[in-house]
Amino acid sequence: MALGARGWRRRSLLLLLLWVTGQAAPVLGLAVSSELQIQQSFVPDECPRTVHSGDFVRYHYVGTFLDGQKFDSSYDRDSTFNVFVGKGQLIAGMDQALVGMCVNERRLVTIPPNLAYGSEGVSGVIPPNSVLHFDVLLVDIWNSEDQVHIQTYFKPPSCPRTIQVSDFVRYHYNGTFLDGTLFDSSHNRMKTYDTYVGIGWLIPGMDKGLLGMCVGEKRIITVPPFLAYGEEGDGKDIPGQASLVFDVALLDLHNPKDTISIENKVVPENCERRSQSGDFLRYHYNGTLLDGTLFDSSYSRNHTFDTYIGQGYVIPGMDEGLLGVCIGERRRIVVPPHLGYGEKGRGSIPGSAVLVFDIHVIDFHNPSDSISITSHYKPPDCSVLSKKGDYLKYHYNASLLDGTLLDSTWNLGKTYNIVLGSGQVVLGMDMGLREMCVGEKRTVIIPPHLGYGEAGVDGEVPGSAVLVFDIELLELVSGLPEGYMFIWNGEVSPNLFEEIDRDGNGEVLLEEFSEYIHAQVATGKGKLAPGFNAEMIVKNMFTNQDRNGDGKVTAEEFKLKDQEAKHDEL
């Protein structure tokens, strides 16, 4: 079609624009520049690397003639074009046009025939002397000299251990191509990737890229394809010759040869006893994973964890880690998974997880323990010692082994009063009050099987708790011989019945009996068992004599204690 003057001027303007700005202009059928023309239609903000001669690239393109007719497109094949740059594998114009490109950069490239297919063209595809226009998007770039590239963007302040060959690790990752396209993510599966390092379970680049990492560290590992899935890709999501970028966060690390480790021990100055196999422990703990994630806490339940140690009641690592502790000790026990919950995990604990227990030992005892008595003060005259049947008045402070105060008579402002051996206190306390003199001060430690047992006292004494009583004996009233609730302090009148039966009617009623016994006690001629209700004792004595239960005692029914079978009362 012939062009008039106006049309010629328009074409000249467009060609000038193409030369000066690199903007592709529509061709109106006349000759164009013989120079390669490049327009950068998009350049990413970050460009850590550009294409150099000798690099291998993966890119998408759309190839058109200058009239807009498409002759080829990588998008139609759903595959990038993969090739070395500067090695004669491309037309000269494309070899030049790709140099200096960044990943994700987009270029519009116009290639004259002399830098394309020349006067011969490509039969059936590209006519001779064709100017070619390519819309190019660079997806990937690497060089055969590349190694694994590591960029650490977070490292915890404390890094006591790093990944070594043969370690087992648990980590999260996002896997992308160089252009940012996500191909896989452990986060999407909500499950860590768990594997050995350095023994061929991973692609070579990841085997190298993970070495030296700390738990809690985050790094970006860029892997060239020859250290990843190579020319063939993985057959699913990863194409051949693809560089891979892994954004990795290391959560866990151990070696199958690991044993438990004990850290951050805080041992009280006074440690008279250390735990042994067979002991029963009460302790608080926080249980976390290596990355600090809390999975359990006894504090949240407001109740200690109570267990035997060394007998398989807890995981092997804790069985071992709790040996040799002192009461009041704090320690951190790090348990590898083969001494914890293994490959399967348990509840909120993932498989193959290293566990960290921060424990505080509250108390422990052994089922074979008896009470422990430590006397702190004895008065100069300490000859009268407490025994079964004695009536005692004493003060005490009751606490747990960790010092937690449970009860105090001093706070209440009154003594605690009991008859020793009558079952009015726990067995360990009964034992701890024996052979004590007035004014003496002692500490009695009572194991739970001699205290309040596994159940404890709801809201007051924890189950299986060892108890500590600081005691001061203030008063001791000697009791009666075992089996007696009343005794005479002198000779008994041979006319006892007649003395009780003051009205001489041959019958003694309860009122008469009670009045007589109390009179004997008041004058010191008789003594009731101390610490018991006097009226109840007298009533029981009367009932024992009232053999036919008619509410009165006759001379025939009346007998003294030494005239009865054992344990009968007056």
Swiss-Prot record:
It comes from the Eukaryota. A motif (Prevents secretion from ER) lies at residues 567-570. Predominantly expressed in heart, skeletal muscle, lung, liver and kidney. Lower levels found in brain, spleen and testis. Its main location: endoplasmic reticulum. The keyword Signal applies. Inhibited by FK506. InterPro entries: EF-hand-dom_pair (IPR011992), EF_Hand_1_Ca_BS (IPR018247), EF_hand_dom (IPR002048), FKBP-like_isomerase (IPR051989), PPIase_dom_sf (IPR046357), PPIase_FKBP_dom (IPR001179). Glycans are attached at residues 174, 286, 302, 397. Phosphorylated. It is an enzyme of class 5 (isomerase). Ca(2+) 1 binds at residues 501, 503, 505, 507, 512. One of its GO terms (biological process) is protein folding. The keyword Phosphoprotein applies. GO terms for cellular component: endoplasmic reticulum; endoplasmic reticulum lumen. It is found in: Endoplasmic reticulum lumen. GO terms for molecular function: calcium ion binding; peptidyl-prolyl cis-trans isomerase activity. Residues 488-523, 533-568 form the EF-hand domain. Residues 1-24 form the signal peptide. Pfam families: EF-hand_5, FKBP_C. Keywords: Calcium, Endoplasmic reticulum, Glycoprotein, Isomerase, Metal-binding, Phosphoprotein, Repeat, Rotamase, Signal. Coiled coil: none annotated. PPIases accelerate the folding of proteins during protein synthesis. PANTHER family: PEPTIDYL-PROLYL CIS-TRANS ISOMERASE FKBP9, PEPTIDYLPROLYL ISOMERASE. This is Peptidyl-prolyl cis-trans isomerase FKBP9.
